[in-house]
């Protein structure tokens, strides 16, 4: 399986609490709910396409509990996202037991989750997908194990909050595999990581790379 990270994000790189102001107030974040006023049919199509590649979900505990509090109530058999989240295999990175809601489809990964993720990647299938789970996504990004990055980029600046990229991650040059613009100006991006390429300059007859 390939490992993909799938996130809603703002222009200033924030992925915290896209749905509602109360969704995630950690760190004193008060500007949640920034995505929903702009979420349109094109956004829904993009998310449905993300889930069309899913073989299993890899979630942090916060996101797992948030999903468990919402998605079991969505019972429309034609809802691809709900069907995958409710019925598909889920791996959650946590040090404590999970509830009974999805007990039959959930496997708990402990502190050695990076080794377990590498094992899961070696298995046949589509994608092992991370949704939300910012701290988990950060750890996977820093470890250099992400194969695909997908973003639904909202034309919003919130001025603070948690996001995927920090100053301690690898330098990458991304290759665009797909991009679409929705009716409300959101951009759905699919990117694959590659070796960082900096600009070059000729100094004293020698080419220097930055």
Spans of features found by a protein language model:
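Portal/gating segments that form or line small-molecule/metal binding sites
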Residues: 1-148, 155-210
């Amino acid at each position: 399986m390939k490992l993909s990270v799938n996130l809603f994000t703002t222009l200033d790189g924030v992925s915290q609490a896209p749905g509602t102001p109360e969704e995630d107030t950690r760190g004193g974040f008060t500007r949640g709910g920034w995505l929903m006023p702009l979420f349109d049919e094109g956004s829904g199509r993009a998310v449905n396409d993300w889930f069309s590649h899913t073989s299993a979900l890899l979630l942090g505990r916060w996101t797992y509990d948030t999903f468990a509090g919402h998605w079991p109530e969505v019972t429309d058999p034609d809802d691809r996202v709900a069907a995958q989240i409710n019925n598909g295999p889920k791996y959650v990175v946590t040090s404590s037991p999970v509830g009974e809601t999805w007990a039959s489809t959930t496997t708990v990964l402990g502190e050695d989750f990076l080794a377990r993720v590498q094992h899961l990647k070696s298995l046949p299938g589509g994608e092992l997908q991370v949704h939300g789970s910012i701290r988990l996504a950060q750890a996977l990004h820093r470890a250099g194990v992400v194969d695909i990055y997908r973003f639904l980029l909202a034309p919003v600046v919130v001025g603070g909050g948690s996001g995927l990229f920090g100053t301690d991650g690898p330098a990458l040059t991304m290759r665009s595999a797909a991009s679409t613009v929705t009716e409300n100006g959101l951009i759905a991006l699919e990117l694959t990581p590659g070796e960082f390429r900096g600009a070059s300059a000729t100094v004293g007859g020698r080419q220097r790379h930055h």
